[in-house]
Amino acid sequence: MAALEVLFILFVSIASSLASEGVSWLLVYRTENYKRGKANIDRLQIQLDKLVDQESETSSLSKKGNKDKKIEKIEEQLKIANKELSFSKMKSMFAVAISMIALFSYLNRIFDGVVVCKLPFVPIGFLQGISHRTIAGDDYTDCSMTFIYAICSMFIRNNIQLILGTAPPKTKQANPWALPEEKKTR
């Protein structure tokens, strides 16, 4: 019985990820606004990479000053374009979030207090609350639906986005903690 429950949770996770990506495609990815924004980000990123490569090859101080200004201008445009693209995705994310919360609530009622599987390890402290949620007892190798659903949904949704080509653009601006190239070399 436990194997069927795990397979059911996996199936629901895959189906919900596909459905959420379908909703995202309908509301966002097929629109001209999104396609223009993504093309603009790609174009700006190529320009920025080209300028950074040229700057590293340039030795003249006056040329570097001009290039620095151009780089700053393009980085600012890239930041604005990323912001606009994120804003256009907002309605889709809202619809997906509501549907995922409803689905999770439904699954939580079905599997309330049910041990779905046994883990071959004891999860570290902060994961025990997720892996042992709604399960009575102190055996932390017992696993609830919440843990399996959360892990599968995160993994499956990211992979579906990669397969469908709807993953967020990978820009240097995406990591707010990344150091600029100048500061890394010092």
UniProtKB/Swiss-Prot annotation:
Parts forming coiled coils: 31-91
Keyword annotations from UniProtKB, A to Z: Calcium, Calcium channel, Calcium transport, Coiled coil, Endoplasmic reticulum, Ion channel, Ion transport, Membrane, Transmembrane, Transmembrane helix, Transport
Positions of disulphide bridges: none
UniProt intramembrane annotation: 123-132
Membrane-spanning segments: 3-30, 89-108, 143-164
Intervals, Cytoplasmic compartment: 31-88, 165-186
GO cellular component: cytoplasm; endoplasmic reticulum; endoplasmic reticulum membrane
Localisation per UniProt entry: Endoplasmic reticulum membrane
GO molecular function annotations of the record: calcium channel activity
Membrane disposition: Multi-pass membrane protein
Any one GO biological process: endoplasmic reticulum calcium ion homeostasis
Pfam families, per database record: EMC3_TMCO1
Lumenal side: 1-2, 109-122, 133-142
Record text on subunit structure and interactions: Homodimer and homotetramer. Component of the multi-pass translocon (MPT) complex.
Primary role: Calcium-selective channel required to prevent calcium stores from overfilling. Component of the multi-pass translocon (MPT) complex that mediates insertion of multi-pass membrane proteins into the lipid bilayer of membranes.
Entry's family note: Belongs to the TMCO1 family.
Protein name: Calcium load-activated calcium channel homolog
Annotated source species: Dictyostelium discoideum (Social amoeba)
